[in-house]
Amino acid sequence: MFKIKKIQTVKFLSKNAAILFVFIFLMSCSKDPVVTPVSVYCSIISEKLLAFSRLSNFEKQRFQELSDTRLQKYKNDFIEAAETFDLEWELLAAVAFQESQWNPKARSATQVKGMMMLTLPTAASVGVTDRLDPIQSIYGGAQYLSELRQIVEYGTSSGDKTAFVLAAYNLGMTNVKNAVEQINGNPSKVTWLELEEHLIQLKSSMDTESYSRGQQTVDFVERVRDYYYLLLSQKCSD
């Protein structure tokens, strides 16, 4: 069991409420507690963290609409699966939204399908027999993220490591490993920003001139981060 560490966690308890604050996805920060009113943290999340988002207003609105409808049906499943594999449920749900917009029947031309858009080999490796079963898919995706977190040895901070895990989820661990080895003689010293720059430059015979597979992975990581922030920001309105 492992935990995908929060880049920064600040908890302010007021009766039964706990507000989770995370600074930015690619920075590791102090773990020291800070005693500040909840409203201040909510203001920071809303005005500062979301300022890094590349999502359009339409995309944010669409996310909120589906968060109020589709997500509510599966929220407890995300929470329980995340607890089982020591993940943040917001991160797990953010991956699912990027993959399928929380649509358990989603399919793609590349034969991945389901809530977490698992490939057939990946599904088999985590014991998923029906990829269109939302509960199986959520738990399978959580287990796969957990396994990747144990395998990934890259990144100089917890935020970096999370980005590498997400890249591996999207691109495949072997492809990430090969890319890292092309960057630096010491893979453990490679940062996410270095891998990001490298991936953007990668091209394959299947890539278009304007959009490479590597760029797709970079976009995947960034969008998961954005959705993760949006889910965290909802704590301020609970």
What are the roles of these predicted feature ranges?
Residues 4-17:
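Bacterial N-terminal signal peptides that target proteins for export
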Residues 17-26:
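Bacterial N-terminal signal peptides
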Residues 26-79, 105:
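N-terminal export signals and maturation junctions of secreted/periplasmic proteins
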Residues 47-52, 163-230:
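Catalytic and substrate-binding regions of cell-wall glycan-acting enzymes that process beta-1,4-linked
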Residues 61-68, 78-81, 104-106, 124-135, ...:
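Second-shell loop/turn segments in exported
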Residues 79, 87-103, 138-142, 165-171, ...:
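Short, functionally critical alpha-helical segments immediately adjacent to catalytic or ligand/cofactor-binding
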Residues 100-109, 148-154, 171-183:
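Secretory-pathway/luminal and periplasmic proteins that interact with or process carbohydrate-rich
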Residues 105-129, 136-147, 196-199, 224:
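Substrate-binding/active-site groove segments that recognize
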